């Protein structure tokens, strides 16, 4: 009997219906963030957008996204002009939340990823639309004839959300080697291609930043886009190297009296409180932005060497993925939501063979489980858990059937790590979501967050190490 697969239209209908059902769901502070940005772009002239600070939710996205908010504000006028008043702080109610969700659902892709499901359709952001642009750019890079459009589309994406700068080194090296230099010799420059790419990127940047540059506001925009005054770790530790570093620091605080270690009293509450700009370590040395930048740059440069030597599309996607890994694992003040920078490009090559799938599997589990704390109200618990677990089961079963055998030897230990890691995730989810509250009530509230973050960090780091091996041995 032939297998039956749903059509794209059927998936779109189901996805759209599900997103409409989520209109009354939990409303995060991001609702007020985007309402305030609508109000700023509608109420003030262009020159004041990046200076206005009536609300703590100041505009800190690049100009193209600010222009998008202005367009959305013109629609919001028809719904309720009161929501466009800057002083109407915390204005969003259920009806306005529904109208914003409806507009946002129409603007994003129909991907059924639990990550986008949690971040965009409940927590409320616009990642789906921008990841759709990223995927289009990555796909366009596959053909020489559309390589220019890939670079220009990515440049436009950078002007919408600056987090994609993390992936820019891979784009720079690939476009340089595959488009600007001759395939026969790196010492021969294709000048016409350089002119077309440079002019296109210049036009995009000029459109985005030109009006602000005329007023001398570029430094102010950069201050908003790159606020290094914030701490190393976000309020909830992103599952990266610094989460593991923070966990070790917490353990050493307990062991310090026995080991004779000195403890900085002023830092004892810093990591557990997770306040912005408040990250300090009690036993281990503090980490500076320079250290984060240096580590990120080093671990991004390593895969770029192979990409420059062998500028194939598979190597390009691998380098984009590894640039995402490096920035997520070693970056300063990384948000847990940034894990999608790794998951989404990696998914394009996860089925290349079983070695790729073996590296992707723990990332898929860790990345999606790490997003659970974003939805902390009881009403969303069954939704996020059942949907994510169901998606992961389908993914593990379907991808396992579809991934072809590798022509190279697989790594026994890594395969066992992947299986064990996925198995442990089930009791961890149960404890952090239900068990802790039953046993401890409202005491030790930081423990489930710490366990989730640290466990997820092990999966992400393990996946990164595994994929580095796969990338350089393929």
Curated annotation (Swiss-Prot):
GO CC annotations on file: endoplasmic reticulum membrane
Membrane topology: Multi-pass membrane protein
UniProt keyword Mitochondrion present: no
Gene: ALG8
Keywords on record: Endoplasmic reticulum, Glycosyltransferase, Membrane, Transferase, Transmembrane, Transmembrane helix
Cytoplasmic compartment segments: 25-101, 177-193, 256-290, 350-355, 400-419, 471-474
E.C. numbers: 2.4.1.265
Presence of keyword Cytoplasm: no
InterPro entries xref list: Glyco_trans_ALG6/ALG8
Any one GO MF annotation of this record: dolichyl pyrophosphate Glc1Man9GlcNAc2 alpha-1,3-glucosyltransferase activity
Residue spans, topological domain Lumenal: 1-3, 123-155, 215-234, 312-328, 377-378, 441-449
Protein name: Dolichyl pyrophosphate Glc1Man9GlcNAc2 alpha-1,3-glucosyltransferase
């Amino acid at each position: 009997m032939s297998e039956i697969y749903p059509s794209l239209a059927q998936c779109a209908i189901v996805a759209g219906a599900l997103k409409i059902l989520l209109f009354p769901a939990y409303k995060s502070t991001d609702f007020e963030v985007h309402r305030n940005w609508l109000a700023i772009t509608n109420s003030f002239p262009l020159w004041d957008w990046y200076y206005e600070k009536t609300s703590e939710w100041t505009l800190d996205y690049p100009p193209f996204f600010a222009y998008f908010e202005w367009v959305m504000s013109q629609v919001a006028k028809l719904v309720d002009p009161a929501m466009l008043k800057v002083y109407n702080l915390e204005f969003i109610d259920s009806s306005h939340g529904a109208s914003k969700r409806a507009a946002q659902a129409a603007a994003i892709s129909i991907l059924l990823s639990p990550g986008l499901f949690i971040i965009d359709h409940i927590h409320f952001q616009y990642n789906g639309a921008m990841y759709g642009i990223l995927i289009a750019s990555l796909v366009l890079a596959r053909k020489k004839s559309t390589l220019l459009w890939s670079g220009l589309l990515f440049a436009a994406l950078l002007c919408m959300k600056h987090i994609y700068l993390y992936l820019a080194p891979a784009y720079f090296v690939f476009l340089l080697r595959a488009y600007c230099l001759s395939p026969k010799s790196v010492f021969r420059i294709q000048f016409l291609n350089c002119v077309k790419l440079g002019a296109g990127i210049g036009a995009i940047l000029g459109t985005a930043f030109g009006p602000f540059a005329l007023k001398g506001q570029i430094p102010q925009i950069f201050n908003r886009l790159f606020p290094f005054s914030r701490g190393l770790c976000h309020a909830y530790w992103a599952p990266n190297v610094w989460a593991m570093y923070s966990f070790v620091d917490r353990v050493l605080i307990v062991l310090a009296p026995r080991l004779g270690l000195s403890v900085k009293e002023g830092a004892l509450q810093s990591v557990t409180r997770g306040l912005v700009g408040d990250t300090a370590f009690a036993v281990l040395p503090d980490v500076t932005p320079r250290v984060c930048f240096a580590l990120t740059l080093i671990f991004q440069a390593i895969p770029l060497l192979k990409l420059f030597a062998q500028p194939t599309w598979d190597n390009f996607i691998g380098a984009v993925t590894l640039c995402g890994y490096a920035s997520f694992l070693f970056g300063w003040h990384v948000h847990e939501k940034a894990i999608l920078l790794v998951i989404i490009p990696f998914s394009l090559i996860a089925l290349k063979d079983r070695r790729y799938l073996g590296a992707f599997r723990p990332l898929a589990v860790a990345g999606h489980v790490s997003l659970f704390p974003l939805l902390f109200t009881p009403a969303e618990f069954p939704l996020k858990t059942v949907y994510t677990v169901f998606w992961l089961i389908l993914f593990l079963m379907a991808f396992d059937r579809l991934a072809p055998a590798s022509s190279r030897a697989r790594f026994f230990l890594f395969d066992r790590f992947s299986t064990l890691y996925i198995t442990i995730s089930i009791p961890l989810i149960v404890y952090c979501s239900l068990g802790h509250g039953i046993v401890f009530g409202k005491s030790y509230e930081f423990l489930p967050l710490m366990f989730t973050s640290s466990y997820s960090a092990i999966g992400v780091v393990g996946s990164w190490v595994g994929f580095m091996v796969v990338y350089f041995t393929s």
